[in-house]
């Protein structure tokens, strides 16, 4: 028996669906009561010791058969009251109507050892009223990716939901990975996601689109009371201040994505958190050879709406949809524009901060924005690895700038040779700027190591771990989890995890591009 304590405020304070169970239906309430569907043989495959500790879970709790039963969807701890939440959203720029938690079921809101709130949510636990004809299950492949990325992003310093556990179900799930008419049976799994709140932009968009101002106001009042209790003011002013905070947090989150080279892949408004947390890890990826037009999502391959370089603009557009949803609560919605302006100001400030940090400078001058933009253009032309380029610059001597520090970063020798003169000229400019900055080599290197990770969860690394896990070997998952807990450190005997994408992975499924199939 664990010592978890639950208060489940969302279920207690927002109107629920009068019908229980997973029957697909239109729901006019905030949430629906639904239990996870049992699985054949739940087995704990991996867990986050840090998240477990925050929840007050002990080693004997994690080792007990009951833990796998609960987080595999077969049982409940006392105090758990499972539900699925109703929301809508804009998908690829178009209103999609009711969406909701199609395969995510929240078990409850636990109070952690720090007094904080931790909503525990199973992904892949079976059908809900929002499953839209799907089975509500998840495959091991996508579950490993979500589990590892949730934790990797946390240790990179990127605002994110967390993952407590990865449980194998013992059941097979049929999926058509690339929607090309070739479905196959894959092992099933369930991830327990953890966050103070899973409320999304779409929770406000759906009642607004339906003209249900009462439910919209209930969502806003609940969110302010539970998740933003310290916001001063009242009425429209308080809602506008809250929207400003959502805009600010979203800007900080996306700036971190751009700093570490992360591409979300599916920035629909139903995948946007009101806490500014990265949420819903599907066909995500990290930029290998630098390309601002790259997207890892096969569904977005033609339009590339959610490509790496447009993520800040998409976030701004999504916030505009949230502002539109909130506008019925305002006599004059013009006050919401201040929040959108706050997004721009915050993002630009974060970008300047990150530019200075990535280049190892004390502060960002206007010329430094041109300097880093010119480096990005060079990386694109020379097909250079983003992570290895910035990490390689740590070892540059401003007194004797030598391009050999970047030798690991190139994917194409012909392009390297063609761009060598331009790169040499850029290194001279950068070296002069470092000397002007005046910091010692040690100080500059320390700044850069704190901003430029050595290790990121490259798709090919995750795919290698998945291949092993599908054969029953979890060692790759455990090794990646361990390495990604120290992404900014040089880890002896772990150099292979920092290597650029190998040639075999350039076009392999799961290593270059992915679908939403999971």
Swiss-Prot record:
ATP binds at residues 100, 102-103, 123, 135-136, 193, 200, 280. It holds the Pfam family SelO. GO terms for molecular function: AMPylase activity; ATP binding; magnesium ion binding. Keywords: ATP-binding, Magnesium, Manganese, Metal-binding, Nucleotide-binding, Nucleotidyltransferase, Transferase. Residues 1-23 are annotated as: Disordered. This is Protein nucleotidyltransferase YdiU. The gene is ydiU. It comes from Xanthomonas campestris pv. campestris (strain B100). The active site is at residue 270. The lineage of its organism: Bacteria, Pseudomonadati, Pseudomonadota, Gammaproteobacteria, Lysobacterales. It comes from the Bacteria. It catalyses: L-seryl-[protein] + ATP = 3-O-(5'-adenylyl)-L-seryl-[protein] + diphosphate; L-threonyl-[protein] + ATP = 3-O-(5'-adenylyl)-L-threonyl-[protein] + diphosphate; L-tyrosyl-[protein] + ATP = O-(5'-adenylyl)-L-tyrosyl-[protein] + diphosphate; L-histidyl-[protein] + UTP = N(tele)-(5'-uridylyl)-L-histidyl-[protein] + diphosphate. The keyword rRNA-binding does not apply.
């Amino acid at each position: 028996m664990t010592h978890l304590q639950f208060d489940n405020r969302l279920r207690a304070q927002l109107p629920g669906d009068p019908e229980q169970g997973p029957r697909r239906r239109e729901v006019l309430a905030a949430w629906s009561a639904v239990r996870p569907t049992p699985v054949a043989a739940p087995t704990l495959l991996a867990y986050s010791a840090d998240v477990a500790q925050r929840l007050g879970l002990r080693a004997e709790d994690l080792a007990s058969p009951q833990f796998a039963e609960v987080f595999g969807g077969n049982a409940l701890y006392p105090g758990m009251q499972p539900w699925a939440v109703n929301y809508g959203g804009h998908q690829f720029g178009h209103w999609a109507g009711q969406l909701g938690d199609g395969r995510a079921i929240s078990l409850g809101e636990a109070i952690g050892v720090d007094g904080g709130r931790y909503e525990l949510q199973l992904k892949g636990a079976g059908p809900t009223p929002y499953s839209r004809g799907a089975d509500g299950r998840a495959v091991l492949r996508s579950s490993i990716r979500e589990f590892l990325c949730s934790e990797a992003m946390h240790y990179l310093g990127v605002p994110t939901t967390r993952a407590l556990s990865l449980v194998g179900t013992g059941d097979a799930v049929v999926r058509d990975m690339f929607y090309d008419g070739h479905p196959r049976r894959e092992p099933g799994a369930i991830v327990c996601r953890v966050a103070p709140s899973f409320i999304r932009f779409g929770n406000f968009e759906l009642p607004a689109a339906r003209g249900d101002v009462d439910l919209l106001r209930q969502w806003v009042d609940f969110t302010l009371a539970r998740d933003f209790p310290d916001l001063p003011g009242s009425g429209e002013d308080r809602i506008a201040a809250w929207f400003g905070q959502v805009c600010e947090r979203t800007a900080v989150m996306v700036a971190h994505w751009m700093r570490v080279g992360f591409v979300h892949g599916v920035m629909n408004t139903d995948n946007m958190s009101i806490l500014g947390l990265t949420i819903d890890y599907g066909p995500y990826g990290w930029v290998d050879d630098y390309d601002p037009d790259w997207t890892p999502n096969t569904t977005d391959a033609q339009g590339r709406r959610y490509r790496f370089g447009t993520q800040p603009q998409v976030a701004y557009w999504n916030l505009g949809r949230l502002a539109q949803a909130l506008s019925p609560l305002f006599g004059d919605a013009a006050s919401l524009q201040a929040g959108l302006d706050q997004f721009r100001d915050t993002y630009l400030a974060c970008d300047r901060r990150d530019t200075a940090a990535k280049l190892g400078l004390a502060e960002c001058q206007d010329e430094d924005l041109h300097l880093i933009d010119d480096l990005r253009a060079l990386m694109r032309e020379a097909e250079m690895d983003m992570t290895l380029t910035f990490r390689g610059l740590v070892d540059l001597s401003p007194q004797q700038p030598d391009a050999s520090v970047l030798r690991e970063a190139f994917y194409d020798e012909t392009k390297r040779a063609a761009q060598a003169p331009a790169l040499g000229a850029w290194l001279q400019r950068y070296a002069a700027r470092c000397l002007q900055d005046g910091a010692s080599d040690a100080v500059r290197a320390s700044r850069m190591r704190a901003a430029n990770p050595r290790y990121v969860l490259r798709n090919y690394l995750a795919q290698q771990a998945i291949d092993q896990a599908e054969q029953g070997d979890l060692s790759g998952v455990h090794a990646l989890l361990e390495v990604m807990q120290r992404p900014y450190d040089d880890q002896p005997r772990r150099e292979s995890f920092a290597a650029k994408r190998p040639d075999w992975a350039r076009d392999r499924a799961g290593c270059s591009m992915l679908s939403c199939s999971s």
